[in-house]
Amino acid sequence: MRLKIKAIWVPTVPDIEYLKKLALRGAVNKTVKVSSSEFHKHTGDSSKTAARKLKQMEEERLIERKIVPGGQLIKMTEKGIEILKNEYIEYSRIFSSEPDVLELEGNVLKGLGEGQYYINIPGYRNQFEEKLNFVPFPGTLNVQLSESSSALRNRLKEMPAVRIDGFNDGERTFGGGNCYPIKVEGIEAAVVVPDRTHYPADLIEIIAPVKLRDALKLKDGDRIVTRVKKQGMEGQK
C-alpha cells in the first residue's frame, strides 16, 4: 500500500519576504497586478522561482490569485496578513525600548450601550469590585485601535489578567472573561476582554470607577494612547 504524503508549507524568511513585498504593493487592501518577470527583481529570485512561489502561496491560501494577460491579479488573504502581523509583533518586541511595555493607541468610539447593561449585573459587578478593587462606572470607554495597534492586541494575553468567572443567575448563563488592570492618566481602570464577543478585534473596552469621557474630557474621535506594563498600565491622551 502506498501512502500519499502532502507537504505542509511553513513560512520561511524568503517566503515572508514575498508577503512583505506584496503588502508594500498594496495587496493587503486591494487586488494588485503582478508580473513574475518583473516581481522577481524585488525578491532576488529568478522569474521561474517567483512564479512557483506565488503559485505555492495560492495553494496555501496566503493569497488569492487570478491569471490575466500580462501577469496575475493578487490579493493577500487573512491568513497571509496574519503572518505579517505576527512578524510585526516580534519586531516590536526586539526594538521596543521597554520590552515589558505594550503601547496601544486608537480613537474613542461611541458605544452601543451594552457596557452599562452588563456592568450593572450583580454577578459581574460584585466580581469587578472584589477582584479589581473598584466599583466600575456603569459604562465602558470604547477605543478603536489603529492598524498597527490592532496587530499588537494579541500581546495582551502575555500581560497579567484578572479572571472574571461566568455564572448562571437562575434565568440565563453569562460568560466569563479577562480583565487587564491599567491606569489611564492616573485613574485606575481595566481593559475587559470577554471570552465571547461580537465586537471586532480592533475594538477594546475600558472600565473605570469614573466616567472616563468626563474625567479626561474625551469625545468621539479623540486619540488616546495606552501603555500596558506587566505590572500595570498607564495611558495618555
From Swiss-Prot:
The lineage of its organism: Archaea, Methanobacteriati, Methanobacteriota, Stenosarchaea group, Methanomicrobia. Catalyzes the CTP-dependent phosphorylation of riboflavin (vitamin B2) to form flavin mononucleotide (FMN). Belongs to the archaeal riboflavin kinase family. FMN binds at residues 197, 205. SUPFAM superfamilies: Riboflavin kinase-like (SSF82114), Winged helix' DNA-binding domain (SSF46785). Its EC number is 2.7.1.161. The gene is ribK. Residues 1-101 are annotated as: Unknown. InterPro entries: RibK_CTP-dep, Riboflavin_kinase_archaeal, Riboflavin_kinase_CTP-dep, Riboflavin_kinase_dom_sf, WH-like_DNA-bd_sf, WH_DNA-bd_sf. Residues 102-237 are annotated as: Riboflavin kinase. NCBIfam families: PRK14165.1. This is Riboflavin kinase. Keywords: Flavoprotein, FMN, Kinase, Magnesium, Metal-binding, Nucleotide-binding, Transferase. Mg(2+) binds at residues 140, 142. It catalyses: riboflavin + CTP = CDP + FMN + H(+).
